[in-house]
Structures are given as C-alpha cells and as structure tokens.
C-alpha cells in the first residue's frame, strides 16, 4: 500500500506503527515520510485493520484504502518500520503530493490499456518485474526505482502513458 499525503508527525507515526505492529505480530516493511507512507505488511485481518484505523483516525489519512491479498504462509521474515525524508527516492525539487498523475481504478485501467495508442510502462525493479507484468508493457529493467529517470527520460511523451 501507499498513500501520498502530507504527514506532519511522520516520526511519531513510525513509533506508533512500530509499537502496534509488534503488538499485533505483523511482518513486512513500512516507510513513513513527510509526503506519505508506503509498505507491505502481513498479519491477521484484525491486526492489519488496526493499522488502517491508526492511519485513518490518528494521522488524517481518511482516503487511505489498502489493497488486500491472502497468503497461506507468512511472506515476510520480520517487521521493519523505516523513516525516510522522501517518499520517492528521486532527485530534484518536486512535491509528490501536489505534482502527481491521476489515479485510475481497475475498470478504467483495463479500458485504457486496451487502447493501442496507450503505452504501459512498468517502473518497478527487476525483481518485481520478473514475477510478472502486464502484457505488452515496457519494462524499465532498473535495479532500483532511483534509476528510473535515466530510462524514463528516453521515452517520448506524446501518447497516454500509464505507470505502475
């Protein structure tokens, strides 16, 4: 999950989330930044719902809606909470809260990618893209997201471009 939003007390959020995550025996990684949160966590539905409530009720992320999936085994070895100064590890002076594209729901996404004039660009790292990607998407083949601008700068943006 991720949520792009200003979080004034992101350091306190990381402490609160670490405390709650340990109490609920969660695993995975959570990043807290002034521009938002990012993470993938595993645990009981009850424990994960407590995290969602913490983010929505105590930190003003009212629009936060995580994506849920199920696993027969715990996919992570440990629980980590990390503080970062930036949500996106990219150079430059930009504000990801104000300067971002439009989010599309899954129904709209499927309609948009069906258009032959749409380019789908997979900006995830090599490990993630080896697991799978959308048919006919352009895979950036980067080791880290921070390497994406070198790849992305070579694309002519005169068509609709979808990033994931």
Language-model region placement:
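Cytosolic catalytic domains that perform sulfur/thiol-centered chemistry
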Residues: 1-164
């Amino acid at each position: 999950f991720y949520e792009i939003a200003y979080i004034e007390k992101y350091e306190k959020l990381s402490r609160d989330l670490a405390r709650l995550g340990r109490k609920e025996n969660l695993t995975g990684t959570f990043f807290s930044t002034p521009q938002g949160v990012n993470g993938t966590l595993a645990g009981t539905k009850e424990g994960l719902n407590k995290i969602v409530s913490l983010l929505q009720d105590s930190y003003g992320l009212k629009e936060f809606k995580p994506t849920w999936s199920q696993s027969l085994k715990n996919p992570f070895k440990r629980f980590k909470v990390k503080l970062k100064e930036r949500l996106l590890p990219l150079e430059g002076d930009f504000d990801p809260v104000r300067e971002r594209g439009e989010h599309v729901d899954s129904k709209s996404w499927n309609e948009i990618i069906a258009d032959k004039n749409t380019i789908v660009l997979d900006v995830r790292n090599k490990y993630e893209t080896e697991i799978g990607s959308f048919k006919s998407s352009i895979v950036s083949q980067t080791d880290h997201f921070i390497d994406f601008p070198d790849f992305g700068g070579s694309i002519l943006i005169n068509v609709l471009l979808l990033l994931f």
